[in-house]
Amino acid sequence: MEFGYTYRLEEPKDYAATEALTREAFWNVYQPGCDEHFIVHSMRENAAVIEELNYVCEDASGIICGHIFYTHTKVVAENGIVYPVISFGPISVHPDHQKHGIGSALICMTMKKAAKMQFSGVLITGNPKYYHRFGFQDAAAYGIVAEDGSSFPELMACELGKHRLDPVHGRLFFCPEFADIDQRELQQYDAQFPFKEKLRLPGQLH
């Protein structure tokens, strides 16, 4: 962990700061503007959120500069058996504090805690080149595919204990709130923040 940073559980008093941080971290990265901060905001009271794993990073001045957000999710087999797993994301680091190991520290410490809490595995989508260092591999290696049955390198799984994912196979279902975003509510929510220009940039996904 980088010297000068401290890590602790997120508290309700941090919500406004972590949502603003998420907006700063994701603005114009994957699309013009972003919706990750709204997703975090809209899920605060959702039973799928795992508050025990949601951590923040503070700089030497006590300003929150990093945040990781966990939710329960599930893998459903063809015979209908449901296997509970977990996921993290968004994981946010303020642009001024990136490349200092904050994201890595948040991932490592929370995954260790998740293992102690006896969760079987973590399922995410992301950049394989980045996440392989934490033990993630192609989810298809565990017989896990996307909700639509597809398989792709960005869909990854990490076992949180030896053989814990052995019985898990089927289609992965993330929280529907991550996809079902009301654009009008997003615009109303985003209006409370300082204006930032939405730009279409090379490399964006949408």
Task: State the predicted function of each range.
Residues 162-206:
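Acidic/histidine-enriched, glycine/proline-rich intrinsically disordered or flexible terminal extensions
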Residues 73-88, 98:
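A conserved beta-turn-beta hairpin within the catalytic core of GNAT-like acetyltransferases
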Residues 52-53, 57, 89-92, 119, ...:
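Internal, conserved structured core segments that host functional sites
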Residues 88, 93, 99-112, 123-124:
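Conserved acetyl-CoA-binding loop-helix of GNAT-fold acetyltransferases
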Residues 1-13, 20:
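Conserved N-terminal entry element of GNAT/NAT acetyltransferase domains
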Residues 63, 81, 94-105, 117, ...:
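Conserved glycine-rich acetyl-CoA-binding loop
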Residues 19, 26-60, 64-69, 74:
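Active-site rim helix/loop that mediates acceptor-substrate recognition in acyltransferases
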Residues 116-119, 126-150:
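Conserved active-site alpha-helix within GNAT-family acetyltransferase domains
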